[in-house]
């Protein structure tokens, strides 16, 4: 489904707003993360289908109310969609997609219910793995002043969102608590294929990391 001219205007306004909002963000959830997720979501949609306006808008807005970045009770996403006069039904769909994007713990069921939500979720998860994923993981760990690694603190597979949200473990644990699990949590065939090499890269990185940690290399 092609994007209508008036929808394209809404997208460009949103892009400008999101760029200014996230331009100086330093935790790995910056404008360039959003830019990559948007581009990947549109790439996935070429093979998987879906409403391109909903996909691109949700990709642009997916971190605006993320719990890691926004502690306010009021939804900035809903407020923005209202301000630019997005159709009510479309706004509801976009908010639903955004709500379903985030990883909430290894034991929490994936609730992406539409092709648009599955695509945006996959695009976001692909940006959490591979070389970019490694870089973003350490950026976030540094942002939160977390140690890189502690041999005495073992990874935990969180069975609920509260446990996952309150986790303060070393950064290396995040690979085992989330990143290495993402390959098998993807929804679309296109994303699953892209994830293969990114997953291998992380495994190679961890092997090298632990060899250097022990002084073997």
Describe the role of every protein-language-model region:
Residues 2-6, 22-31, 35-48, 61, ...:
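Divalent metal-dependent phosphate-bond-processing catalytic cores, especially two-metal-ion Mg2+/Mn2+ enzymes
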Residues 4-19:
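Short alpha-helical hairpin
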Residues 13, 47-53:
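N-terminal glycine-rich anion-binding loops that anchor highly charged ligand groups
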Residues 37, 73-84:
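An active-site-proximal "capping" alpha-helix that borders the catalytic cofactor pocket
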Residues 52-69, 77, 94-104:
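His-Asp-centered metal-binding catalytic motifs of divalent-metal-dependent phosphohydrolases/nucleases
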Residues 84-121:
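Hydrophobic, well-structured mid-protein blocks that either form specific transmembrane helices
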């Amino acid at each position: 489904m092609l994007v209508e001219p008036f929808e394209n205007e809404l997208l460009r306004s949103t892009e400008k707003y999101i760029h200014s909002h996230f331009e100086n963000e330093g935790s790995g959830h910056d404008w360039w993360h959003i830019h990559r997720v948007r581009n990947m979501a549109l790439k996935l949609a070429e093979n998987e289908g879906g409403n391109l306006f909903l996909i691109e808008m949700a990709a642009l807005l997916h971190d605006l109310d993320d719990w890691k970045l926004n502690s306010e009770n009021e939804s900035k996403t809903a407020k923005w969609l209202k301000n630019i006069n997005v159709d009510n039904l479309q706004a509801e769909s976009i908010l639903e997609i955004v709500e379903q994007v985030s990883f909430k713990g290894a034991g929490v069921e994936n609730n992406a219910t539409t092709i648009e939500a599955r695509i945006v979720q996959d695009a976001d998860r692909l940006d959490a793995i591979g070389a970019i994923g490694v870089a973003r993981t350490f950026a976030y760990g540094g942002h939160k002043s977390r140690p890189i690694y502690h041999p005495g603190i073992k990874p935990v597979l969180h069975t609920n969102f509260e446990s996952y949200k309150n986790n303060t473990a070393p950064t290396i644990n995040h690979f085992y608590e989330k990143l290495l699990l993402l390959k098998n949590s993807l929804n679309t065939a296109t994303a699953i294929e892209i994830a293969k090499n990114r997953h291998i890269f992380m495994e190679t990185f961890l092997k090298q990391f632990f060899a250097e940690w022990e002084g073997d290399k």
